[in-house]
C-alpha cells in the first residue's frame, strides 16, 4: 500500500509505510474513516488530502481532519485522521433558501460546484419546492433528496465523483477465515407493527413470520415510516456474522459476501453492514460484519 499526502500548495508528499493503520466503512455512516500512524524524521507540513493506493488503484482519498505529531523514546510519529470525500458535504452548510422544482443539476450548481465537486452520476427531478433551513449541511440536503426520489444513499468515490443512485451490488468471495463470531439478538425482532389508519386508530396490523416473542410497535401516519421496513430492520439487526480474513478486502460498499466458516456453516448472499481493514506488524487483515443472507 502506498500513501500520498497533498500539501496546502497542492504539491505531493510520499508518506511511506505506516506503523499501523485502519480503514473503516459503515453503511450507516456517510464517510469512510482512515486512521494511520507514520514514522517521521521531522515535523511535516500541514496536509490537506491523503490518498492510499494499492497496485495503482486508489483505495481511499479523503480530507485530513487531524494531524498529530508526537515525540517519544522511539522517535517522531505523525498520526493522521481522515474522512473520505463525503466529509466535504458534511462540513459545509447549504445556503438557506427555496429551490423551485429542484433537480440534481440545480443542486449540483448550488451545493456541489462551489465545493469543487463537478462530476455527478444520476438524474432526478421533483415537482415540488425544496426549502433549505439555516444550519442544514449540504450532505443532509443531498442525501434526503436522493433517498426521497431515488431510494438510495449518495456517495463520493475515490476519483471525487458523486454517485446519487447508490452503490452497485458487488460479490465478495471470502476465502480463509482467521476468526469469526456469530451473534444472534432475538430481542431486536419486532413481532408486530400496528399502523395508524385515516380514522385515527391503530388498527392495521403487520406481522413478522420470524418473531417467537411478542414485541409490538405502533406507527403513526405522521412518521411516514413503512411498518414493513420496521419489521425488516429488526430482522436484520437480530443477526450478525463477524469474520476476519487475511489481506485487504476493499471496497466493501454494496458488497454481498459468500463465506464458509469451519464449525459455523456456510453463509451466502450476506450484505456487508460494516468493515475495518487493518495494517500493523502482523500484516494486513480485514474484519467484516455481515447481515443475514439467503
Which residues are covered by each model-predicted region?
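Solvent-exposed edge beta-strands and adjacent loop segments
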Residues: 1-28
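A broad structural signal for short, well-ordered beta-strand segments within beta-sheet-rich domains
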Residues: 14-20, 64, 125-129, 177-183, ...
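Oligomerization/assembly interface segments of phage tail-like spikes and tubes
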Residues: 22-40, 75-87, 237-245, 272-273, ...
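Acidic, small/polar-enriched beta strand-loop surface segments
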Residues: 2-3, 143, 147, 152-294
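Short amphipathic beta-strand and strand-loop transition segments with alternating hydrophobic
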Residues: 20-26, 65-71, 275-278
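Glycine-centered tight beta-turn/hairpin loop motif at sheet-sheet or coil-to-beta transitions
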Residues: 10, 55-57, 264-265
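Charged- and aromatic-enriched interaction segments used to assemble
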Residues: 76-77, 81-187
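Surface-exposed cap/loop segments at beta↔alpha junctions
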Residues: 38-118, 285, 292-294
Amino acid at each position: 500500500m502506498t500513501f500520498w499526502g497533498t500539501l496546502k500548495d497542492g504539491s505531493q508528499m510520499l508518506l511511506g509505510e505506516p506503523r499501523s493503520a485502519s480503514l473503516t466503512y459503515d453503511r450507516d455512516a456517510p464517510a469512510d474513516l482512515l486512521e494511520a500512524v507514520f514514522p517521521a524524521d521531522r515535523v511535516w507540513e500541514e496536509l490537506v488530502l491523503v490518498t492510499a493506493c494499492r497496485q495503482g488503484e486508489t483505495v481511499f482519498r479523503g480530507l485530513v481532519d487531524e494531524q498529530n505529531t508526537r515525540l517519544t523514546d522511539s522517535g517522531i510519529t505523525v498520526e493522521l485522521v481522515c474522512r473520505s470525500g463525503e466529509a466535504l458535504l458534511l462540513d459545509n452548510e447549504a445556503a438557506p433558501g427555496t429551490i423551485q422544482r429542484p433537480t440534481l443539476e440545480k443542486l449540483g450548481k448550488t451545493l456541489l460546484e462551489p465545493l469543487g465537486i463537478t462530476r455527478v452520476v444520476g438524474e432526478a427531478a421533483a415537482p415540488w419546492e425544496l426549502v433549505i433551513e439555516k444550519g442544514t449541511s449540504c450532505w443532509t440536503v443531498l442525501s434526503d433528496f436522493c433517498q426521497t426520489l431515488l431510494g438510495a444513499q449518495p456517495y463520493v468515490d475515490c476519483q471525487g465523483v458523486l454517485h446519487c443512485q447508490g452503490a452497485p451490488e458487488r460479490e465478495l468471495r471470502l476465502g480463509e477465515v482467521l476468526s469469526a463470531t456469530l451473534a444472534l439478538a432475538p430481542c431486536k425482532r419486532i413481532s408486530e407493527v400496528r399502523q395508524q389508519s385515516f380514522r385515527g386508530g391503530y388498527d392495521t396490523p403487520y406481522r413478522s413470520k420470524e418473531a417467537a416473542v411478542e414485541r409490538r410497535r405502533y406507527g403513526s401516519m405522521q412518521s411516514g415510516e413503512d411498518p414493513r421496513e420496521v419489521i425488516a430492520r429488526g430482522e436484520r439487526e437480530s443477526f450478525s456474522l463477524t469474520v476476519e480474513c487475511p489481506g485487504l478486502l476493499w471496497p466493501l460498499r454494496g458488497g454481498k459476501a459468500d463465506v464458509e466458516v469451519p464449525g459455523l456453516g456456510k453463509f451466502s448472499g450476506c450484505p456487508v453492514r460494516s468493515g475495518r481493514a487493518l495494517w500493523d506488524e502482523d500484516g494486513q487483515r480485514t474484519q467484516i460484519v455481515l447481515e443475514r443472507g439467503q
